[in-house]
Amino acid sequence: MEAIAKRLDACQDQLLELYEENSIDIHKHIMHWKCIRLESVLLHKAKQMGLSHIGLQVVPPLTVSETKGHNAIEMQMHLESLAKTQYGVEPWTLQDTSYEMWLTPPKRCFKKQGNTVEVKFDGCEDNVMEYVVWTHIYLQDNDSWVKVTSSVDAKGIYYTCGQFKTYYVNFNKEAQKYGSTNHWEVCYGSTVICSPASVSSTVREVSIAEPTTYTPAQTTAPTVSACTTEDGVSAPPRKRARGPSTNNTLCVANIRSVDSTINNIVTDNYNKHQRRNNCHSAATPIVQLQGDSNCLKCFRYRLNDKYKHLFELASSTWHWASPEAPHKNAIVTLTYSSEEQRQQFLNSVKIPPTIRHKVGFMSLHLL
């Protein structure tokens, strides 16, 4: 047990160093997935030995560590393959190479620089869904990789590989889930595209960049026949609350990148307003950490090891379960005995740039 504990500590220390470094080098992210793989192997072995805890860390069930290990192997192999091509020298962030991004439609390919497309179903301003059009999509074709861009038309969102068009969002299928009249309007930038059933004229096609180019990596010539034309359906995106309906107006979607670096966020509104509220005299000061689940676990381990005197309690990692949740990140909540202790924590502890943190109060009475 002692040998496993030492190797696990070293592995998690290296993971946290990688998170704090926040590199854009693809080889650092390959190392990151190697560490995740080793961590899963150690936890799997510990569970087979009958251990339920290693220090403060709970040993997960065998199926959990096995699945996580398989995911790490998958990501490591694909990143190593991509690193050998001309695209390996491009900047790659932890978010770009995360397993969550890997499974984001279109699934099992790398993607960068996402822009939002809003689709209004049944002409209802309150029934608007958001989808992502990617500026760069990296597809594996046998031993080589190709880089394409995605576009949107009245049918859905697609990318073109060679002469084959693949839809990864089908608006007709989405309309069957979120609408009742099989009518939708696509708002992209300052352009509105209506569903084929609502117009008789030819629907205009919009691309997010220049005309789609088929750019194979220089390692080996790709085989176009490997690209499929199966329609993919995305997971239900977040539904946005809309204001009152406005007729005969041009629909303008705010374009924002989902691939930008996330900076630390500390809200100071409580300094201006909430401190004046007497109800906070009985509330518990907290800091809410948001980010990758494994990154949060490593960071919490370091906090318990080196900074336990700067906070009271640390929660397990948790997620919002509602489909309307504002994000899918894991969350860890830290509590403090006073606002002064919390401020001392924020002044003393370096929070990795991949973790967002917000301050607030918890009105529940802790036992």
UniProtKB/Swiss-Prot annotation:
Region named DNA-binding domain: 283-367
Domain of life: Viruses
Post-translational modifications: Phosphorylated.
Biological process, per Gene Ontology: DNA replication; DNA-templated transcription; regulation of DNA replication; viral DNA genome replication
One Pfam family matching this protein: PPV_E2_N
InterPro entries assigned to the protein according to its UniProt record, in alphabetical order: E2/EBNA1_C_sf (IPR035975), Nucleotide-bd_a/b_plait_sf (IPR012677), Papillomavirus_E2_C (IPR000427), PPV_E2_N (IPR001866), Reg_prot_E2 (IPR033668), Regulatory_protein_E2_N (IPR036050), Regulatory_protein_E2_N_1 (IPR042503), Regulatory_protein_E2_N_2 (IPR042504)
Region listing for Disordered, in residue ranges: 225-246
Any GO MF annotation of the entry: DNA binding
GO cellular component: host cell nucleus
Subcellular locations according to the entry: Host nucleus
Annotated region described as Transactivation domain, given as residue ranges: 1-200
Alphabetic keyword roster: Activator, DNA replication, DNA-binding, Early protein, Host nucleus, Phosphoprotein, Repressor, Transcription, Transcription regulation
Subunit structure, interactors included: Binds DNA as homodimer. Interacts with protein E1; this interaction greatly increases E1 DNA-binding activity. Interacts with protein L1; this interaction enhances E2-dependent replication and transcription activation. Interacts with protein L2; this interaction inhibits E2 transcriptional activity but not DNA replication function E2. Interacts with protein E7; this interaction inhibits E7 oncogenic activity. Interacts with host TAF1; this interaction modulates E2-dependent transcriptional regulation. Interacts with host BRD4; this interaction mediates E2 transcriptional activation function.
Job of this protein: Plays a role in the initiation of viral DNA replication. A dimer of E2 interacts with a dimer of E1 in order to improve specificity of E1 DNA binding activity. Once the complex recognizes and binds DNA at specific sites, the E2 dimer is removed from DNA. E2 also regulates viral transcription through binding to the E2RE response element (5'-ACCNNNNNNGGT-3') present in multiple copies in the regulatory regions of the viral genome. Activates or represses transcription depending on E2RE's position with regards to proximal promoter elements including the TATA-box.
Family under the similarity heading: Belongs to the papillomaviridae E2 protein family.
Name the UniProt record assigns to this protein: Regulatory protein E2
Lineage, highest ranks first: Viruses, Monodnaviria, Shotokuvirae, Cossaviricota, Papovaviricetes
Gene: E2
